[in-house]
Structures are given as C-alpha cells and as structure tokens.
Amino acid sequence: MKTDIIPVSGSEVHLQEALRQAEKVAAFEELSTRETLQLRLLTEEMMQMMHSIAGPMEGEFWIENKGREFELHLAADIRLTSGKRAKLLSASTSGKNEAARGLMGHLRDLFDRGADEDVARFSSSMLDHGFAEMGGATSMDWEWSMIQYQNALTTSVENDEEGAREAWDELEKSVVAHAADEVKVSLKGSRVEMVIYKRLG
C-alpha cells in the first residue's frame, strides 16, 4: 500500500498532516496502540529532522508498506549552490555549520552535499562512512545507509580512530537510530530522498 503523497515543510501544520497520514495507515493496517505510537514517533522524528536538516526546504512525504514492513519517505528537489549555502550559513548566529556531529549532523551534511554544486570535491572520512556511489566516476548520485555507518563506526571505535567514540556516542543518543531498522539517504540528480524502514509486529 502507498499513501497519498503530501507536501511538507518544517511547519507545524505539515507535521500534523504527516502525523494524520501515519494514523490513517495505522488504522488501515489495524496496528496496535504501541505500533501506532512507533509509526507516529518515526514520522515526527523524520519531519523534525527535515526541519533541522533543511530549514525552509519543501518536499513530499508518504508511507509505503507491504504487510508489516513500513517505509516512510521524504523527498525533495534541492538546488542550492555553494554561494547560496554560504549565505545561509552566514545568517546563522555563529556563521558556521555547527551540525556536522552525530547522526543529525551527518544527515544534514548529506543534504548539504546533495545541494552543493561542489559535491564532487567534498571529502570527510567520518561523513563517508556508509556511502555508496551509484553510477560511474562522473556521477553525483550516492546513497548513505545508517547500518553501514554503524558498522563503519564500530570498526573506527575498535581502531581507536580520532572522533569515532564521540560519533558513536552521538549515534547512541539518536531516537531514529534506536527506533528505525534502517535509514537511507540517496541523491539522484537534484532529488534527495530519505527513507526510514521499520518492521512492526
């Protein structure tokens, strides 16, 4: 089953619409109260992540499921040049991107990378954990996986790499990391999509 695709932004109105969408799915699939709350929590976290990651960006939200396997989708077309990104950052209180820590920071950087025309030149070893290129050497398409990121962090912690323990601690604090089975963020052209996977029941 696939729900209607609804427009979303970081607004409270859109959050409530997304939560209603989750409740409709829960009712249709006859989920328990606990399962309904889990679906609502993931929806709310995803919407808050969008607001935190992308600010005023507008996108689309929908839910798909096959039986008890649920996918929450959030997609947006992003066209933000490096110059515009710098302008946005200069408008922040500190004038710098303070977000590149923890799961939220990594996801925010992923959205920035997808929005940045200079994505091919961007490189950060901690951010690249969990990345997979999708296409040839000149392709800007990529996908990030939370599971691959967790696995890479585990290895980094075992090897006592700089920053690995802090990144692991931040991941452990993430509601999504505990509630979701998997989170994937992908870029195809200028379209960024985040999918949260969760099996209920």
Kindly label every feature range from the protein language model.
Residues 1-4, 51-201:
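Conserved beta-strand-loop-beta-strand hairpin that lines the nucleotide-binding pocket
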